[in-house]
Amino acid sequence: MFFSSCRWSSVPWWTDSQSDKGEKIFRYDRLVDEFVSLNSFTSLQCMNTEYPAATRLLIEEVLAIGAVQEPRKADPSFRIPFMYTQISGLNQSIVVGDSLLGISLDKYLGRDYPLYRKYYHDYQRRVMDRSWLVSDALFYYLSHEYPLPDDKVHTLLDYIADYGKIHWVIAHCRNISLEQEAGFEEERVLWYKENETEVWNWLMGHGVLTSADLTMIRLFMEPRGTTPYIGKDSPDQIGLWLGLQIIDHYMKSHPRVTIGELLHENDYEKILRESGYHPSANKK
């Protein structure tokens, strides 16, 4: 695969010499290996600037042979995206257009990459690693293909269940746990489980679950370190945890519902009602 991506060149840069007067063979495979193994930003830049055709072939055609085709098994109407990579200047990690999926490789160089440590918080850096690339790409593309309808104002419940739905589908398709897909460390999972009932009762009792206040929605959905309204030691993304539980209960209660049907379902009040999810009752 990589040999076919190499090219003959008389330029003595990153090459294997065959003879003093012979041609030079550029080792594209070495660039890929250094980028994958060492998170080499220099190698990544070279792949995209000096050898764009080879990199485009690798990303758009070779990698497309694999798991990117899997969603069609769950939903035949799923559109396989045309993929490309880019250097975004630390802008958006994933860019989605009409059947297009752009991946900013400079946002996945490892959480301890020096530039990240200088400009990003710990909670932001925890997903800036290549192990997150697949989940991020799938999440943003699925969210684009199966969006919340724009004919109504959406509540926290809508976002909780919608995020939970997309992540649940990704975990199912990738055959990994819900916690692994969401990036929940053991400490956070323990807190969620111990405080699930109290958090749910607080959301219900204060009318937050049915609130369309974007500030409150962001507070419970986005990475931010802590969730102040619940307590100074409470972790972030509590809404995502609750959404995963709601969808998991719903799918276990409706084994005949397909992944495709779930993706097209946007009535989240119905899903909550039919899921049987109620933390205090579930713990009995």
Q: What annotation goes with each model-predicted range?
A:
Residues 2-5:
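C-terminal motif of bacterial Sec signal peptides marking the signal peptidase cleavage site
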Residues 71-79, 173, 177, 203, ...:
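Sec/Tat-exported extracytoplasmic proteins
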Residues 67-70, 168, 202, 242, ...:
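Amphipathic alpha-helical segments that form well-ordered structural scaffolds
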Residues 211-284:
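C-terminal soluble interaction/assembly domains
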Residues 164-227:
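Acidic/His/Gly-enriched intrinsically disordered linker/tail segments
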Residues 64-189, 260:
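Acidic/His-rich structured neighborhood in mature extracellular/periplasmic domains
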Residues 7-69:
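N-terminal mature-domain "stem" immediately C-terminal to a signal peptide or N-terminal signal-anchor/transmembrane
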Residues 156-164, 190-194, 233, 237, ...:
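Soluble non-cytosolic domains of exported or imported proteins
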